[in-house]
Amino acid sequence: MKRGQGPTIRRRRLASELRRLREAADLTIDEVGEKLECSASKVSRIETGHVGVTPRDARDMLELYGLTGDEREALVQLAREARKPGWWHAYKEVFTGTFVGLEADASSLRAFQALLVPGLLQTETYARAVIRAMRPDADESDIQRRVAARTARQELLVDPNPPQYWAVIDEAVLHREVGGPEVMAKQTNRLLELAQLTHVTIQVVPFAAGAHPGMEGPFLVLGFPEPADPDVVYVDSTSGGFFLELPPDVRRYTLMFDHLRAAALKPDDSLDVIATAAERYSR
């Protein structure tokens, strides 16, 4: 799939353009809501990309902002395309479309994990053990559904046009026995296999590195192919995670990732550490 052409990134792009045009028209969110007979909160949610916008609403807003002709119709068409369901809609009860949609459109993904193997790199048995541990009240059908959703996400790495994926993990990830030795043996070997892909890089931050920026928690920096689509950061948490889009926040996490890469072992040395773990679990 061509990166940056999915419905989520189109919605984000349209939201940014609607906000820019409103500001250029010297209108406040409250004034737009009053003129279009809708709530100011609806306008705000549209501009932040938290909700989609119908082609009719987009046309009404664009007319109010003074945009006409082909330029207006191009943005109305963008609104239509942004409403098309992505593959992840089949798993809407598992994860938010915004996260998976942006992940699917990204041209680069920079992930840090201190406790677990990143989701895109997990084997099915490792994912099952993680989900079962983190959701002790889930029944087997719910667990299976979540495993299937995670497996579907992983198709991204074998796409004909995959994103550049760079994962930095703490050495503790290799020592935390999730699911037992057999599960860990398969998981560590899976990491070695994926690291052979030209678009995948895996590094390990050794215990000897001491304190590091990633101690704050796991995060993902998503980059996109078009200059009009700025980078965004996803900070993971048990309550569902959240996005950071303000430039200072994105710069901070980008710098954190750069420091983590520097603190980590070189990719080849990291694979040696992973191979040692794989051998240990295979005994």
Language model region names:
Residues K2-S16, R20, A24, D30-E34, ...:
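Interdomain hinge/linker segments and adjacent boundary elements that couple functional modules
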Residues L27, C38-S39:
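The short coil/loop that forms the "turn" connecting the two helices of the helix-turn-helix
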Residues E37, Q77, G210:
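Positions that flank functional sites
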Residues E37, T54-A58, V232-D236:
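Short acidic (Asp/Glu) and glycine-rich catalytic loops that position anionic groups and cofactors
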Residues C38, W87-W88, F219:
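Tryptophan-centered motif/residue detector
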Residues G180-R283:
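C-terminal regulatory/effector modules of DNA-binding transcriptional regulators
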